[in-house]
Curated annotation (Swiss-Prot):
Keywords: Ribonucleoprotein, Ribosomal protein, RNA-binding, rRNA-binding. This is Large ribosomal subunit protein bL21. Part of the 50S ribosomal subunit. Contacts protein L20. HAMAP family: Ribosomal_bL21. Pfam families: Ribosomal_L21p (PF00829). The lineage of its organism: Bacteria, Pseudomonadati, Rhodothermota, Rhodothermia, Rhodothermales. Residues 85-135 are annotated as: Disordered.
Length: 135
């Protein structure tokens, strides 16, 4: 099973257990669990693909923050010839490393849904073969 998720306007193809670098989340700390609810596409691996418009309803991905890291240095060099103008600057972009723990095509399971399923599976009090009472 794989999914395409949108994290801060960047799209990533993810599977359970994947580790990836996403744009920096300033409010997330190492070890914190994130719920990625902007799932654009879900595939179960058997060729069955669900495409969202723009997102797939009730589909989520759960991820754990591993650490905050900086990317490779990008050198910005400006120069104007014959004018003795040269500026050299460097920049390191910040990223958040996350690990995908689970993909849920039907959204997160809640206790209310489980209770409703248990109630619907319970046998009815009345005998279905009994004849209805006449009024």
């Amino acid at each position: 099973m794989y999914a395409v998720v949108d994290v801060k306007d960047k799209q990533f193809k993810v599977q359970e257990g994947d580790t990836l670098y996403v744009p920096y989340h300033s409010d997330a700390t190492a070890g914190q669990e994130l719920t990625l609810d902007r799932v654009l596409l879900v595939s179960d691996g058997d060729g069955d693909v669900t495409l969202g418009t723009p997102t797939v309803e009730d589909a989520t991905a759960t991820a754990r923050v591993l650490e905050h890291v900086k990317g490779d240095k990008v050198i910005v060099f400006k120069k104007k010839r014959r004018k003795r103008y040269r500026v050299k600057r460097g920049h390191r972009q910040q990223y958040t490393q996350i690990e995908i723990e689970s993909l849920n095509a039907n959204g997160p399971a809640s206790s209310d849904d489980e209770e409703a399923a248990e109630t619907s599976d319970a046998e009815p009090d009345e005998d279905p073969e009994a004849e209805p009472a006449e009024a």
